[in-house]
Amino acid sequence: MAMQSGFIKRIRDIMRMDAGINGDAQRIEQMVWMLFLKVYDAKEDDWELNEDNYESIIPEDLRWRNWAKADSNGHAMTGDKLLNFVNNTLFPVLKGNDVKEGDTIVYEGIKVAPDTPIKKAIVKSTFEDANNYMKDGVYLRQVIDVIDEIEFDDVKESHAFGFVYEEILRELQSAGSSGEFYTPRAVTEFMALMIKPKLGEKMADFACGTGGFITSWLGQLSKQVTDTSAQKQLDDSIYGIEKKPFPYLLCVTNMLLHDIEATNIYHMNSLKHNLLDYTDADKFDVILMNPPYGGHEDKSIQGFFPDDLASSETADLFMSVILYRLKKNGRAAVVVPDGFLFGLDNAKVNIKKKLIGEFNLHTVVRLPSSVFSPYTSITTNLLFFDNTKPTTETWFYRVDIPSDRKHFSKTKPMELKHFDDCIAWWNNREVIPDGEYFKSQKFTADYLLNEQGCNIDLCGYPHEEEEVLDPLDTIREYQERRTSLNAEIDKVLAELEALLPGGVIK
């Protein structure tokens, strides 16, 4: 427990003295690439013990054990020598570049071929965009020493560090734009619990960030592991894609900490694939994810999608990917912003028609706006659906802020217990009136598609929460609502014009 409370603070205090570290996001990135090498070195100990002729992809001199640790005389690299080694030897080689002295190659950059085992290939993909921000070799030495104190071959200490790593990920919520990579643990745990994982299934997250959904999935599934065969099924049950380098590094390190060795986590863009080219081999039993919304993608990305599904909103594009990559009889749980529910632009309407008309959208859970605070105050929702049949009816349930809170916050975040009422309701569904509103209600697919015209913003919050939106969030929400209102007006005008004797008004 001492490690949990002291580890992050010790490193933070050292890094604050280094002129190269600018803000929490850089501090965390700096910490995590070193953690990755330390954890990877511990894993290599296991692989060397259990595999015949195991050979590291990292050159011997550049393995953590041979440069980060003190030698037999207690001497360790430090100062300018350490800084020069990290910047001009370690990083270039791990990124795949040769290191030369004159015309002589001193170290070859690590090479990855199509047949390179995933557990080796992740070293290069993890370091492709990693950075060493520290400018002082003495402070760098001090941070390395703190990290090297952790004994990952000690089961109890390794388990305890899992909590430390979770705290590191939570800090991302207040580290500027990096917060977008972190979905609160309560949300990922609830979604994994409700999706009911089964051994033998394969689960995917196409924008996996730090690996929160994957970790929650593994946590639920691990309860079913009783032998080595089942453990292999667990290890093989995940698939993740992350476009951005920093969260990819966080996710891979997260998987190593959870003893997932042949981790199927890929550093690429899920949206850069023709939607209509997916085959059954590209589909999954379960999809759990929080698609990025309000993100920025090159306009060319829309070319990978049919015209009726093309959108500038990344959440819409990911919803289409999910629908095309969910196996027959598969299950999905997805976080979406309010804008997806009420939005009536062409893409959103067509996505919702496909979702309701071809899939079974059985449950929509409304979340309070402060669940993702302080990263965003935009209200989010959880969609639960399966690929078994078209929707006949959809239940909506509103999760309310506890009576003793005004809102959730960084210091008082949402916890799994705040879903207790929803979990109890889930297994015994009933309509719950709330004055002139409803906390829970069910609607037919016909009502959602025709009477509502695909506006499925139902069972919302009767009173605006006392929460001031971030200016960018406010702009984004008003833009969504303006688009929605314009679409509604166009629809009503078209219906009225159709009733006129002469048709369209000139």
Set out the residue ranges of the language-model regions.
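Charged, amphipathic alpha-helical interaction segments
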Residues: 35, 222, 256-259, 327, ...
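A short, mixed-charge helix-start or loop-turn motif at secondary-structure junctions
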Residues: 173-174, 234, 304-305
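A conserved structural/catalytic subdomain of Rossmann-like adenosyl-cofactor enzymes
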Residues: 267, 278-506
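Helical mechanochemical/support elements of P-loop NTPase systems and associated helical scaffolds
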Residues: 7, 24-27, 139, 160, ...
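Conserved S-adenosyl-L-methionine
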Residues: 177-289, 294-296, 312, 316, ...
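Non-catalytic, mostly N-terminal accessory regions of nucleic-acid modification and defense proteins
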Residues: 1-194, 198-199, 266-273, 366-370, ...
